[in-house]
From Swiss-Prot:
Family classification: Belongs to the nitrobindin family.
UniProt cross-references to InterPro entries, sorted A to Z: Calycin, Nb(III)_bact/plant, Nitrobindin, THAP4-like_heme-bd
Chain span(s) of sequence motif GXWXGXG: 75-81
Protein name as it appears in the record: Ferric nitrobindin-like protein
SUPFAM superfamilies membership: Lipocalins
Alphabetized Gene3D superfamilies for the sequence: 2.40.128.20
Region (Disordered) location: 1-21
UniProt superkingdom: Bacteria
PANTHER family: PEROXYNITRITE ISOMERASE THAP4 (PTHR15854:SF4), THAP4 PROTEIN (PTHR15854)
Length: 228
């Protein structure tokens, strides 16, 4: 998965018979999967006095009106991707849960696991949790279109991204602040691009600053909608 593919989003294949066939096939697969994913949601305890988190827009609280530009992200996403580490490239599996409770933020939880050459589980890998929201600044309407993504990583660092929607189905963010714990790994800032691509899948590309100070490819994945 490349940055261009994610940036262009859904409906980007070339206008050719081959492209049209690919698009039709992707739409058919997406429609087929949606009949299953539409009936799924994340588990919830029904004895709490607060609204339950939901990853299915058909259930639970209404999505906060300030988050409509992020609506396509809500759901449970599963798939595979490729990463680059100190020991070379590797494959990983991943699940991302994007939920809400009616508040002015989206809950974000991503966990991944390394895969061996046979595509089977090898070991746990990266995990992060956090929140998406839009900046609210009544004195600067343009700034109010900015996205905040606050993440805590299991590797021992906290990261704040800022960004903007590129269009109705893709979002680009860049690290603004980074803090590592005493036991955490040392990492550089990152740039992430998320997009809904052909077939309704969620794809992303992450580039991260290396020891030489330049952005280099770090992670990329394409995930299908499992729930929502």
């Amino acid at each position: 998965m490349t940055s261009d593919e994610v940036r262009d989003g859904a409906g980007s294949p070339a206008d050719s018979s081959k492209g049209n066939k690919c698009t039709a096939a992707g739409m058919f697969q997406a429609a087929k999967r949606s009949t299953v994913s539409a009936a799924r949601n994340i588990p919830a305890f029904d004895d709490l006095p607060v609204p339950s988190d939901t990853a299915n827009l058909r259930e639970g609280a209404n999505l906060n009106s300030t988050l409509l530009a992020l609506l396509p992200l809500v759901g449970v996403w599963r798939g595979e991707g490729e990463g680059r580490g100190p020991n070379g490239d590797y494959h990983f599996g991943q699940q991302i849960v994007v939920s809400h409770d009616g508040g002015n933020y989206l809950n974000w939880e991503a966990r991944s696991w390394r895969l061996n050459d046979a595509g089977e589980y090898q070991e746990t890998s990266l995990r992060e949790t956090g929140f998406w929201r839009f900046v609210s600044d009544p004195y600067d309407p343009t700034e109010s279109q900015a996205i905040e993504l606050l993440l805590a990583h299991s590797a021992g660092y906290v990261e704040l991204f800022y960004g903007r929607p590129r269009n109705a189905s893709s979002w680009e963010l860049v690290t603004d602040a980074l803090a590592c714990s005493k036991s955490g790994v040392l990492v550089g800032g990152a740039k992430r691009l998320y997009g809904i691509v052909e077939g309704g899948d969620l794809a992303y590309v992450e580039e991260r600053v290396d020891a030489d100070g330049g952005l280099v490819p770090n992670l990329s994945a394409r995930l299908y909608r499992f729930a929502g």
